[in-house]
Curated annotation (Swiss-Prot):
Listed Pro residues bias regions: 78-87
Name of the gene encoding the protein in the UniProt record: Nudt19
Subunit structure: Monomer.
Cofactors, names only: Mg(2+); Mn(2+)
Organism per entry: Mus saxicola
UniProt signal peptide: none
Residues where Mg(2+) binds: E112, E116
Protein name stated in the entry: Acyl-coenzyme A diphosphatase NUDT19
Sequence positions bearing N6-succinyllysine: K299
Transmembrane segments: none
Region (Disordered): 72-94
Length: 356
């Protein structure tokens, strides 16, 4: 617990699938529409994912992964050094018998993708490692009943995998980064690991019609256009990541990038919200105004200046300017670091802004 906010660990997977239809973009991302009755981000379009459950870390998974994959890394490669946590943010001591975070968070993302979208990111237990984009498992008989059981009790996901003689395809999920919910957006705040999975083909999606009421497969540019035209709503982290993915022209390029990245580079960001006299700016690590201080876990920065004044003064930037609920701008002047990429600057034409 930090101040008044209760932090929960979570994982989300950006599911990128090859697109065979005639289109300049070579892949689409799965976006799920959250139900309006959800307390966190109601109605938003989000990547599949959810809160880490104790069942995701259970040592009972060890028997399922054996004998091909064994502790402590289960074939994920060397353990990467961890980014120091944001000052003042702690999740307490880990259970020494639990699975490593890298494994548990991947299982969490895969389980939640099944619960929310009906997509099974599983691999037969005896299948060798793949050097190309993965493929979702074809829906088995009795899927609806299993899905209901897993939603009621996450421990049933292990039972489902054993029933299918499969393991969660943790090796198809690549570290991408992570986001901490900024102060003020909600009393429910999340420490969310972002993972990326490339699939050769688009799998069948069946929203659960409880947490999720719809879905779309959209390219990064299509998602941006749908957001600007108010067809979908994206939270700032999802918008930033969509714009980051705009750097990749094809699924193969994205897959190569994820596969070749060093393991030690995944970073987790806490946006600090700078409230101006006429709007707000989400400051991200590397920005000249960003302050990594525990005080900002529970408060925002503020200024009497207008947003444009702040922008004119800035030189070293990594920020999202919130013009309105459906107009965000991204400004980055930092060079790419740690073998990751930044989004290109994204500025909305003023004449278009006036119409939105």
């Amino acid at each position: 617990m930090s101040g008044q906010s209760s932090w929960r660990r979570a994982a989300t997977v950006m599911l990128a699938a090859g697109w065979t239809h005639s289109s300049p973009a070579g892949f689409r991302l799965l976006l799920l529409q959250r139900a309006q009755n959800q307390r966190f981000l109601p109605g938003a379009h989000v990547f599949p994912g959810g809160v880490l459950d104790a069942a995701d870390s259970s040592p009972d998974w060890v028997r399922l992964f054996a004998p091909r994959h064994t502790p402590p890394r289960f074939g994920l490669g060397p353990e990467p050094p961890r980014q120091p946590p944001f000052p003042g943010l702690s999740h307490g001591d880990a259970d020494p018998a639990a699975l490593p975070d890298d494994v548990a968070l991947r299982i969490c993302a895969i389980r939640e993708t099944f619960e929310e979208a009906g997509v099974l990111l599983l691999r037969p237990r005896d299948a060798p490692a793949s050097q190309e984009p993965s493929q979702a498992l074809s829906p088995p008989a009795g899927l609806a009943e299993w899905r209901s059981r897993v939603r009621s009790d996450p421990r049933c996901f292990l039972q489902l995998c054993a029933h299918l003689d499969c393991t969660p395809d943790i090796w198809a999920l690549h570290d991408w980064g992570g986001w901490l919910t900024p102060y003020g957006r909600s009393l429910r705040r999340f420490d969310t690991t972002f993972l990326l999975c490339c699939l050769r083909d688009t799998p069948r999606v069946e929203p659960d019609l409880a947490e999720v009421v719809g879905y779309q497969w959209l390219s990064p540019s299509e998602a941006t256009e749908c957001f600007l035209s108010k067809e979908i709503w994206l939270a700032p982290p999802q918008f930033y990541e969509m714009r980051r993915l705009e750097n990749f022209a094809s699924l193969s390029a994205l897959y190569r990038f994820c596969s070749d990245r060093p393991l030690e580079v995944a970073q987790k960001w806490l946006p600090i919200i700078l409230v101006t006299s006429d709007g707000s700016v989400h400051l991200l690590p590397g920005d000249e105004l960003y302050v990594k201080d525990s005080d900002f876990l529970e408060k925002n920065m503020s200024t009497d200046k207008k947003t444009e004044e702040i922008m004119k003064e800035g030189k070293v930037l990594n920020r999202i300017v919130i013009r309105s609920p459906y107009v965000y701008e991204i400004y980055v002047t930092l060079p790419s670091e740690n073998k990751h990429v930044f989004p290109r600057n994204y500025i909305v034409n003023k004449s278009r802004t006036a119409r939105l």
